[in-house]
């Protein structure tokens, strides 16, 4: 006997609409007899679907029949219309039956828009120095999107690139996308507080993200200038006195100038170095000039002058050698490695203890077989006040060598320089065979360059 089919809609189990994958919709008819059946498809407005239809062969199950029809539609044909469903028309036994098959909901997610700005030291190249603004739109769907840039509200026609839209997390539901656009800017425009806008257009909506430099011209009190006197180590090693002028809290190093001059106004050759950028976005810089030791020791005065566009007038800082303080030469003790350490056969530590000196400025170096060792080979502590002896200082320097070097009879020398020593320098030498330091008074490692006064 004839049995009419029961019909059911079929929808895709895949993630919601993307811009590439076809959308599968289907119609299932089952429990019918005899086996002759056909399907057609219409849009919601009754126009016929003529492409992408596939009807599968009829299957016999439990004495009756089952059949399915599938339609594959591109997202474009759905997204551009307002259809909420398709109509599956089942033709059986001279009768027709319509079944509404709902179109899968279109996932719509607005983009998250962020613009990343360059750090203060992020500009490079010849003037005008350049850097980049990076606009990132993430977590949006569907895929079609447009990114553009504005400068002070006017559309930027060139100088930017926009990467292809990419999938964020494959397999996620719904499928989301991201896109990155990069705009090249000049340091001058950035520091002049030009406002840059990343504009993102998606699904008829516009998303704007504005950025600009927040470093307005700083008041003059924000820029700080310090003078740093030459250290004894510099004087001892190079026979010249290096005057340092440290400038901090700079919003930019453009227009910065640091110059040194003598008390008579004679300019000194000044080397300027941009030191670093700080977490608060400011810069430090220093200007260094070398003068002869005699002028420094004779307490001649020198002046550092700093000019910058954020200063209403030049900053001037004066420096000269401080008045005499009580001088006392250091006592130097050289300690060989401890036997317990050597028994481990790993390393050997030679310690140079320097005590009872004043002023605190001192130089400590090491020699191996008479050759100067690089500073990376040893560690010297900063001078500390001597306990129970006000006005006096101590320090220690540790040289670590291999156990094999020590046992081979290598000689190690601690060289100490201090202005209260008769020849500015003294040294102690130790090796395995003696086990006791030997005292020498030398002036062998002072530089023969620089510092000559005329």
UniProtKB/Swiss-Prot annotation:
<dbReference type="GO" id="GO:0004888">
    <property type="term" value="F:transmembrane signaling receptor activity"/>
</dbReference>
<dbReference type="GO" id="GO:0048471">
    <property type="term" value="C:perinuclear region of cytoplasm"/>
</dbReference>
<dbReference type="GO" id="GO:0002637">
    <property type="term" value="P:regulation of immunoglobulin production"/>
</dbReference>
<keyword id="KW-1133">Transmembrane helix</keyword>
<feature type="region of interest" description="CH1">
    <location>
        <begin position="1"/>
        <end position="104"/>
    </location>
</feature>
<feature type="glycosylation site" description="N-linked (GlcNAc...) asparagine">
    <location>
        <position position="242"/>
    </location>
</feature>
<dbReference type="GO" id="GO:0002344">
    <property type="term" value="P:B cell affinity maturation"/>
</dbReference>
<keyword id="KW-0964">Secreted</keyword>
<dbReference type="GO" id="GO:0009897">
    <property type="term" value="C:external side of plasma membrane"/>
</dbReference>
<dbReference type="GO" id="GO:0050778">
    <property type="term" value="P:positive regulation of immune response"/>
</dbReference>
<feature type="glycosylation site" description="N-linked (GlcNAc...) asparagine">
    <location>
        <position position="210"/>
    </location>
</feature>
<dbReference type="GO" id="GO:0019882">
    <property type="term" value="P:antigen processing and presentation"/>
</dbReference>
<dbReference type="InterPro" id="IPR003006">
    <property type="entry name" value="Ig/MHC_CS"/>
</dbReference>
<dbReference type="Pfam" id="PF07654">
    <property type="entry name" value="C1-set"/>
</dbReference>
<dbReference type="GO" id="GO:0005737">
    <property type="term" value="C:cytoplasm"/>
</dbReference>
<feature type="region of interest" description="Important for oligomerization">
    <location>
        <begin position="324"/>
        <end position="454"/>
    </location>
</feature>
<feature type="disulfide bond">
    <location>
        <begin position="352"/>
        <end position="414"/>
    </location>
</feature>
<dbReference type="InterPro" id="IPR007110">
    <property type="entry name" value="Ig-like_dom"/>
</dbReference>
<dbReference type="GO" id="GO:0022604">
    <property type="term" value="P:regulation of cell morphogenesis"/>
</dbReference>
<feature type="disulfide bond">
    <location>
        <begin position="245"/>
        <end position="304"/>
    </location>
</feature>
<dbReference type="GO" id="GO:0005886">
    <property type="term" value="C:plasma membrane"/>
</dbReference>
<dbReference type="GO" id="GO:0016020">
    <property type="term" value="C:membrane"/>
</dbReference>
<dbReference type="InterPro" id="IPR003597">
    <property type="entry name" value="Ig_C1-set"/>
</dbReference>
<feature type="region of interest" description="CH4">
    <location>
        <begin position="324"/>
        <end position="435"/>
    </location>
</feature>
<feature type="disulfide bond">
    <location>
        <begin position="27"/>
        <end position="88"/>
    </location>
</feature>
<feature type="region of interest" description="CH2">
    <location>
        <begin position="105"/>
        <end position="216"/>
    </location>
</feature>
<dbReference type="GO" id="GO:0045022">
    <property type="term" value="P:early endosome to late endosome transport"/>
</dbReference>
<feature type="site" description="Cleavage">
    <location>
        <begin position="96"/>
        <end position="97"/>
    </location>
</feature>
<comment type="subunit">
    <text>The basic structural unit of both sIgM and mIgM molecules consists of two identical heavy chains and two identical light chains; disulfide-linked. N-terminal variable regions of the heavy and light chains form the antigen binding sites, whereas the C-terminal constant regions of the heavy chains interact with immune receptors to mediate effector functions.</text>
</comment>
<feature type="glycosylation site" description="N-linked (GlcNAc...) asparagine">
    <location>
        <position position="257"/>
    </location>
</feature>
<dbReference type="GO" id="GO:0045807">
    <property type="term" value="P:positive regulation of endocytosis"/>
</dbReference>
<dbReference type="GO" id="GO:0005615">
    <property type="term" value="C:extracellular space"/>
</dbReference>
<dbReference type="GO" id="GO:0034987">
    <property type="term" value="F:immunoglobulin receptor binding"/>
</dbReference>
<comment type="function">
    <text>Constant region of immunoglobulin heavy chains. Immunoglobulins, also known as antibodies, are membrane-bound or secreted glycoproteins produced by B lymphocytes. In the recognition phase of humoral immunity, the membrane-bound immunoglobulins serve as receptors which, upon binding of a specific antigen, trigger the clonal expansion and differentiation of B lymphocytes into immunoglobulins-secreting plasma cells. Secreted immunoglobulins mediate the effector phase of humoral immunity, which results in the elimination of bound antigens.</text>
</comment>
<dbReference type="GO" id="GO:0043410">
    <property type="term" value="P:positive regulation of MAPK cascade"/>
</dbReference>
<keyword id="KW-1003">Cell membrane</keyword>
<dbReference type="GO" id="GO:0050829">
    <property type="term" value="P:defense response to Gram-negative bacterium"/>
</dbReference>
<dbReference type="GO" id="GO:0009986">
    <property type="term" value="C:cell surface"/>
</dbReference>
<dbReference type="InterPro" id="IPR013783">
    <property type="entry name" value="Ig-like_fold"/>
</dbReference>
<dbReference type="GO" id="GO:0071756">
    <property type="term" value="C:pentameric IgM immunoglobulin complex"/>
</dbReference>
<dbReference type="GO" id="GO:0002331">
    <property type="term" value="P:pre-B cell allelic exclusion"/>
</dbReference>
<dbReference type="GO" id="GO:0003823">
    <property type="term" value="F:antigen binding"/>
</dbReference>
